[in-house]
Amino acid sequence: DALGADAVILDLEDAVSPQEKDAARILVRNALSLMGFSCQTVVRINALDSGLCQQDLEEIVPQGPTALMLPKTTSAQQIQQLDAAVSRLEQSHGMPLGKVQFIPLLETALGVENAFSIAAASSRILGLFLGGEDLTADLRCKRTKEGKEIDYARQRVVCAARAAGVEAFDTPFTDVNDDGGLWEDARYAKSLGFTGKASISPRHVPGINAVFSPTQAEIAYAQEVLAAIDEAKRQGRGAISLHGKMIDAPIVTRARQTLASAQILGLIGGETHGN
């Protein structure tokens, strides 16, 4: 049970000590095979150069997780190498080619600087994930609740993801007891364009969902915008206004995005306007 989360991340990397890697690999394999998760499943594998990655792939890929998370991704070449390895395993196990997607974890200065080439390196890329803790260590700066030290990285990751047509996932807020801080951090991430945000605690999931889900007011306004577009088309009008404000193409685009998100989350039905 993911407690309302859209996905659960099963970790084979930082959360597992070297002597426990084999046992963790078996546990994750069995969890994917037997537990029947009600949400998407992501497995953070060990780095390509760790000497552990191939074993991870051999155990995990046949179980068909939604995505693999590659830690400390710094180049498109790493993604292409991973793509080739996963493709071989999919073929050998009779799986559809491309079934398993990738979420590169950008947690170094080099990874952030190469964000677009990484995002565009494979059709398997589901989205980019920013790792704030390791990034600040690499930048030799202190990680703070306010997060100003990762502003540049956040903006660059979002821009790269959008340019490549993939999603952008924000770093977790690490103080599990500061609900107000989580709320502000999540709202700020959403304002930058992030699709969603990771959580290290189940208690953060409802707050994150509330921030990243469209509100009823946002849904109602988006529906009004698209209804106004439909009405203007019927009347042959080019200029469109709503509540005294001109409706231009970016507003229409955001309205459609809002309703698409609401549909995915089951907040509204499948019928839209303004197509």
What is each model feature region?
Residues 1-275:
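Expand to "…catalyze enediolate/carbanion chemistry for C-C bond making/breaking, isomerization
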